[in-house]
Amino acid sequence: MAKGEGNVLAQHKKARHDYHIVETIEAGIVLTGTEIKSVRAARIQLKDGFAQIKNGEAWLVNVHIAPFEQGNIWNADPERTRKLLLKKREIQHLADELKGTGMTLVPLKVYLKDGFAKVLIGLAKGKHDYDKRESIKRREQDRDIRRVMKSVNRR
């Protein structure tokens, strides 16, 4: 867990498998009252989500926040686009990185920090199938090496 990161409410576990994460940035999320209650109850899914830059603002798209059960008429659309709170120079940096490079912004995790909901956004480049196979092969080799070293150290 990164420094200052509170309790993690949701993670996009497959993101590091599907993408090369180049850089991460912490951003706040603009939420309604019933949405923050659902987020605190960990009823959020990042699987299909992504972020985009439009008109100098950062937006979180396709992140599903389940309707709050006691929210009735105050519940917002679960799939609505939510504004991300970033500094202007951070948004400009991300916009420059995204221009024509095959990069995308992927939400990696949502957590609470000092009572506020934060999202860790990753600047990512998609992996090819052979990259994924290579990552799996490397992980299995590391696991085998650790297993052998553990058995050698026990003797």
From Swiss-Prot:
Main location: cytoplasm
Coiled coil: none
Signal peptide per UniProt: none
Keyword Cytoplasm assigned: yes
Record InterPro entries: SmpB, SsrA-bd_prot, SsrA-bd_prot_CS
GO CC terms, sorted: cytosol
PROSITE patterns recorded: SSRP
Example GO BP: trans-translation
Location relative to the cell: Cytoplasm
Domain of life: Bacteria
Keywords: Cytoplasm, RNA-binding
GO MF annotation list: RNA binding
PANTHER family per UniProt: SSRA-BINDING PROTEIN, TMRNA-BINDING COMPONENT OF TRANS-TRANSLATION TAGGING COMPLEX
UniProt family annotation: Belongs to the SmpB family.
Cited function: Required for rescue of stalled ribosomes mediated by trans-translation. Binds to transfer-messenger RNA (tmRNA), required for stable association of tmRNA with ribosomes. tmRNA and SmpB together mimic tRNA shape, replacing the anticodon stem-loop with SmpB. tmRNA is encoded by the ssrA gene; the 2 termini fold to resemble tRNA(Ala) and it encodes a 'tag peptide', a short internal open reading frame. During trans-translation Ala-aminoacylated tmRNA acts like a tRNA, entering the A-site of stalled ribosomes, displacing the stalled mRNA.
Name the record gives this protein: SsrA-binding protein
Organism, as annotated: Streptococcus equi subsp. zooepidemicus (strain MGCS10565)
Organism lineage: Bacteria, Bacillati, Bacillota, Bacilli, Lactobacillales
Name of the gene: smpB
